Amino acid sequence: NVLGMTVDEAVSHLDKFIDDACLANLGQITVIHGKGTGALRKGVHNYLKTLKKQKRISGYRDGEFGEGDMGVTVVIL
């Protein structure tokens, strides 16, 4: 949950959370960033795009109906 954080705070939080999730052999995680103005979502997606290029994650997608819609991002590890 990165609600209320700046993009820099969210990226720092996500970096550790993704590492911990990989160590725990989780298949995916859900990042709650909220809908708001979309700035936090955009920052999270830019960071995840970098991680995908570095092959640290397999991919990511917007949440679907019932998952949180555009207020969450699902990260496939």
Predicted region positions:
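Long, charged, low-complexity intrinsically disordered regions
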Residues: 1-77
